[in-house]
């Protein structure tokens, strides 16, 4: 299993981990060249002689957080996601897609969801646009577990929906780009 460590591992961007069930699989990870002109070359990664500072920082972040820290953080994130999900469920102009655990995708049948995304962005929220169906998603992280965040999101989501309703044909922001890209019948032709 592989995982990037910057969101939930609390490490800097640029690191990932590859987890093996046991040593028998991990041994295939190594690159070994016995014929290299510089001598025997062994590397545990594709990157070869890449500096180890990011790996060391990742290791330090994971050791500092510890198993119990990760368990506690996971619990807080899942609780925050429940609160944010309730906010989305309570907003009549948007609807959740699927039955999400912590990555909350939602769409709208009444307003341009990408305009909602743009307005939320102006209010400091980092959501990503999705297509087919037109939707946006919020990836719940530990930052969303702070007190009052769900209430602030409820306030900002309601204001963003109203702004999208009031300016349905605005040409600024990401809404026009997402709308146009989502309308291509053959996406690979772009």
Model-derived segments and spans:
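Active-site C-terminal subdomain of aminotransferase-like
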Residues: 1-102, 106-111, 184-187
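Non-catalytic terminal extensions of PLP-dependent enzymes
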Residues: 71, 90, 100-101, 107-190
């Amino acid at each position: 299993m592989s995982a990037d460590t910057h969101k939930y591992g609390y490490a800097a961007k640029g690191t990932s981990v590859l987890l093996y069930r046991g040593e028998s699989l991990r041994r295939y990870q190594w690159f070994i060249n016995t014929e290299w002109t510089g001598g025997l070359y062994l590397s545990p990664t594709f990157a070869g002689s890449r500096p180890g500072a990011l790996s060391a920082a990742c290791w330090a972040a994971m050791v500092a957080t510890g198993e119990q820290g990760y368990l506690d953080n996971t619990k807080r994130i899942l609780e925050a996601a429940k609160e944010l999900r309730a906010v989305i469920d309570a907003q009549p102009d948007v609807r959740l897609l699927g039955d999400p655990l912590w990555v909350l995708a939602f769409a709208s049948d009444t307003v341009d969801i990408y305009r909602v995304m743009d307005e939320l962005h102006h209010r400091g929220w980092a959501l990503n646009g999705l297509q087919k169906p037109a939707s946006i998603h919020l990836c719940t992280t530990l930052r969303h577990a702070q007190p009052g965040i769900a209430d602030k999101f409820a306030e900002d989501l309601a204001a963003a929906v109203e702004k999208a309703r009031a300016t349905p044909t605005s040409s600024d922001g990401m809404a026009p780009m997402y709308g146009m890209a989502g309308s291509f019948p053959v996406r690979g032709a772009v």
